[in-house]
Amino acid sequence: MKKILLVLFLMLGVVSLAAPKYLDMAKLQKNSYQIIQDEEGAFLFGKSTEDVGLTVGIYNIQESNDMAKKISEEVKTGAPAEQKFVSSRENNRAYVNKFKANDGSYTYSIVAKKTKIKNCYISILYITAKDFKDVELDKVVDKTLNEVESYLK
């Protein structure tokens, strides 16, 4: 799973930016997140538990014309070969792409449609062995977005 996380970290590197001032770094570290990338334009952090691998990208992009959808499409087209695209859907909060890896694990790419901060886009890779159905997936998306948004000041 760690090898998959590394590949997915690279996949999230679509756009590059420095640790945003609107992120609560103390809270991130308190909740055991590791900083993966801290460059101007893109800030990536993640953590892995027994059940879930989570990688979050916070992007500061000036263009706002349907950028969340564009990011979601970029993740879909830029996925590694060992990640087979299964489906995509959207709910009121996010665009969600589902991938299945050769080892049977699932990766859910979650891109928030709206954020509290202008020009701030959130992209999440949620890796698990579970094959979520629509209602359950919506709950996971809401819970995950709520957690990530709680780190925004």
Residue locations for each model-derived region?
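Signature of long, low-cysteine stretches enriched in small and polar/charged residues
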Residues: A79-K116
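A short acidic-to-branched-hydrophobic micro-motif
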Residues: F45-K70, Y121-I127
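Short, solvent-exposed coil/turn segments at beta-strand boundaries
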Residues: K30-N31, K47-T49, E90-N92, K113-Y121
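Sec-dependent N-terminal signal peptides
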Residues: I4-V14
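N-terminal "mature-domain start" segment
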Residues: L17-F45, P80-E82, R89, T144-E149
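Short, surface-exposed coil-to-beta transition loops
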Residues: D38-G41, G53, D103-V111, C120-Y121
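Surface-exposed amphipathic alpha-helical segments
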Residues: Q29-Y33, Y126-K153
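Short, exposed beta-strand-loop hairpins at the edges of beta-sheets
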Residues: F99-G104, K113-V140
